[in-house]
Regions:
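Proline-centered helix-kink/hinge sites
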Residues: 23, 29, 68, 103, ...
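Cofactor-binding active-site loop characterized by glycine-rich and histidine/acidic residues
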Residues: 1-65, 83-101
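Conserved thiamine diphosphate
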Residues: 30-39, 90-121, 170-202
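Short, contiguous strand/loop micro-motifs
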Residues: 45-46, 79-81, 169, 198
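Glycine/aspartate-rich loop-and-adjacent alpha/beta segment that forms the canonical ThDP
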Residues: 125-241
């Protein structure tokens, strides 16, 4: 669980208190809006964190100002070890946007085409002056809250403890794994096995190349650890240091 980002590519590092990430991205959207920039923003959050006050404050500001941002709310079916029924009384998590007066809709998180079309639609809507949106994604977390939590979630191999996840629900979502199912869909649409194999080889090369690049990099100079994080350095942008 490495919390890193790449500011010049528009990716902010995740924050450990998850709702704060939505607040931060809303602030970025506000800044972009005030500057008149043609930029779209995305903030992702799980259903558990959507119960927090910070998240609601972010949505309220975005809706009031008509900011160019979309909030992606993933219903993972369980937050740490709390099921949705004990978190909210909404039937659909998309309904949370109604109170803020913003459009929302629900998609199947196992369908890559739905992801692409939904975010593209939200982007076009925001940048044409429509304001923020909320995309409710139905999916399921396949492991523990973090990997050190897997035994509590899935249960130990011995069966003791048995784990708290709903096994039938987990089996349902495992059968919807988008990697094999979307591959089958592409074959049914006319792509050939050779074309898919070539795509997969190209993707693997990209990942391997990125990994090799990172492994070859020198370790950061420890004397620079505080640069750009306090007002003493007077950094105008994140890129100065």
């Amino acid at each position: 669980d490495l919390h890193v980002g790449c500011f010049h590519r528009g990716v902010l590092p995740p924050t450990a208190p998850l709702p704060i990430a939505s607040v931060t991205m809303t602030g970025m959207a506000l800044s972009s809006w005030k500057r008149g920039e043609d930029r779209f923003h995305v903030a992702c959050i799980g259903e558990g964190s959507s119960s927090s006050g910070e998240w609601w404050e972010a949505l309220n500001l975005a809706a009031t100002r008509g900011l160019p941002i979309s909030y992606i709310l993933q219903n993972n079916q369980i937050a740490l070890d709390t099921p949705p029924v004990n978190q909210s009384n909404v039937e659909l998590w998309a309904d949370k946007a109604v109170a803020m007066g913003m459009p929302s809709w629900t998609i199947d998180g196992s369908d890559p085409a739905s992801w692409h079309s939904s975010v593209a639609c939200a982007r076009e809507f925001s940048l044409s002056g429509g304001g923020p949106t909320l995309i409710h994604v139905e999916t399921m977390r396949g492991c523990g809250h973090a990997h050190h939590h897997d035994d509590l979630y899935l249960g130990a191999p011995s069966g003791t403890p048995p784990g708290y996840v709903d096994r039938e629900l987990l089996d349902y979502w495992e059968a919807k794994d988008p990697i094999p199912t979307h591959r089958k869909l592409m074959l049914s649409l006319g792509f050939t096995e050779d074309e898919l194999t070539q795509m997969e080889a190209e993707e693997k090369d990209l990942v391997d190349s990125a990994r090799e690049h990172v492994e070859a990099m020198e370790w950061a100079d420890p004397t620079t650890v505080t640069l750009g994080i306090t007002s003493l350095h007077d950094a105008d942008t994140h890129q100065d240091h």
